[in-house]
Every structure is written in structure tokens, then in C-alpha cells.
Amino acid sequence: MQLGVIADDFTGATDIASFLVRNGMPTVQLNGVPTRDLPLTSEAVVISLKTRSCPAEMAVSQSLAALRWLQAQGCQQFYFKYCSTFDSTAQGNIGPVLDALLAELGETRTVISPALPVNGRTVYQGYLFVGEQLLNESGMRHHPVTPMEDAHLGRLIERQGRGKAALIAWPIVARGPEAVAAALAAVNDPAVRYVVLDALSEQDLLTQGVALREMKLVSGGSGLAIGLARDWAQRHGARGESAQAGMPLAGPAVVLSGSCSVMTNSQVAAYRQQAPARAVDLSACFTDLESYVRTLTDWVDAQRDAPLAPMIYATTEPQTLQRIQAQYGDKASSERVEQMFAALAAALKAKGFTRFIVAG
């Protein structure tokens, strides 16, 4: 098995798994760290954790458990996947997790490559952009859990980790894989653990994929997976085979949206104009969760024959979110919404729903 991916949340794991498959690498996605070996025949395994916003100690422990399981399956290269908006404050866990993974693997250096140009995430001179805006000037500055106040990836990772950061800027990336590999080899300061990579286009990600094929540990958003998978598929003549390894299930579908990001708010606003949609009543979640889940289940089930999948959404704008958090508390409101969605998904599965679209 070639690649083992440790993803810090479920939606991100799904993103990177789909990019790997689309670019030619047969992939299996797992929810959580398995407790036993599995008879896998894929070339990549993605383990979905729930560590994006948890304390560093917990994130490190779970990430190391995932790494050790992937090592036991014979993976040759490892990929720590976080969000393309680098959701993490100075107290965040990206740096501590990278430090722990490097130590476990006996490595001294990795890369930071969150760029995903197809979604408007680019890196230039080490600064992360969302569309035309710097990260800290975008909607991410209002993120309810990880408000982003700086767009400079080197500074962000140095505040969290135990090492220094270096940069391979776009003019070098534009010269191709050999130039990137040479620049990596030329980083001779032993204090540098993290090398930030610029990327403005998919071609830059393809360049990175070739240049990093021998690096034991890489890190980034989903974008770098495009380059790694495409390079692997071209070298093994496997492009196109991965898409035939499994097909989506048929059957009733439902959309469950819990993210309160600016992008998800826009997507929910557009979708609810076209499909049956119902907002989550947080007070009902606290008053009688079991009864409220039954109410939502019955509503979704009644819409199963609609042309577009019905949607249940807790997505809301920052002002409303602040009022909710003030009333119920940040942690309590977040956990109760998660409990509601978990119970709702289980109830809908029992009703015969087979496709769950998790927005955000």
C-alpha cells in the first residue's frame, strides 16, 4: 500500500479520498482508527478522525494511533490532512501533530501545502488566500471555533510547533519538480521543520506531487493529493481504474448541514430555494432531543420522493450564531447539534435512506 492519510475531520477525509480516486489512486476511507488489521487491496487508505478543534494532546494521541495502524498495513508514505483554510489558532494542534508524526517516523522535515485552487485556496509568498482575499480578511476571520487572524502560514505553524518554517516561493515551483526538490534539499537549517509551498494552480500541485513522491510525511489540504495520486497513476499506468473500484449507492438521499462558514451559508441559501429545507430549532434540541429527532425524521421521510434531496440545516449567519452561543454556551450548543445530527442520521438509515450528504 502506498499512501496512508490521517484526516482531522470527516468531511475533509471525504474530500481527499475523492481527489485520490479521481486522479487514479484506488482508495478506501475509514471512520476512526480500526481496532484490527483489514484485508485492504487499495493503494491509499484515508482515516477520518475528529480532531480539528480538540486539544493538542488528544489530537496527537489519535493521530499517532492512526499512523501506527497505517504503518502496520504497509503504507510507504503518510499524509496529514487538514483544512485548506488551515483552521487553527496559535493554540491549535496542527503543529503538535506534525511534530509528533515526524518524531514517530524518525523524520526531521515536512511540507505545508493547504492550497486548493479549484476552491479558490491559493498560497503566494507563504500567504494563504481565499479567492482574492487574504485568509484573515475573508469570512474565516469570523469562524466560531478557529477565527483566523493571520494569513502567513509560516507564522501560524511556528506559533504552534517546535520548529522554524521556510518557504519555497512560486517562482521556484513554476520551474518544475526538479527545482522544488532542489530547493527542499537546499534547506540546511536543522531548526526548519516545516517548508511552506506556494501554489496558484493545479499545475503547481502536480509539480509538488512529483517533487514529494519520496518524502515520508507530507501535510496539506486535499489539493496536494491531486499531485501525489496523478504522479502515482502515471508511473503505474493505473489512471481510470480507481473510479471502477466502487460505485455510489442508490436510494433516498438527505442533506445534513451543520457548518456555519460563509461558504456553507451561501450554499444553504442557494439550495433551500430549490429543495425542501428545514432549519434546526436549537431550543427543541435542548428541550426534548428524542422527540425532536422523531419530528425531523418524519419530515425528511415525507420528502423522500422530492426531485432534490431534503435538507436539514443548523447553518446560520455569525450574528445569530453569537446569540445562540450566548444563550446555550459555545460547547454545549455545538455538542447538542452534533448529537441531534447523529441521532437523525441513524433514524433515517433505519427508514431506508442510503445517501447522506454532509455539508460543510
Tell me the role of every PLM-derived stretch.
Residues 1-2, 43, 59, 67-78, ...:
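Cap/lid and interdomain-hinge subdomains that line or gate substrate/regulatory clefts
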Residues 5-7, 28-30, 78-82, 110-114, ...:
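General beta-strand structural signal in soluble alpha/beta enzymes
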Residues 32-34, 55-69, 340:
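Glycine-rich, highly charged phosphate/nucleotide-binding loops
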Residues 300-359:
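C-terminal structural cap/anchor segments
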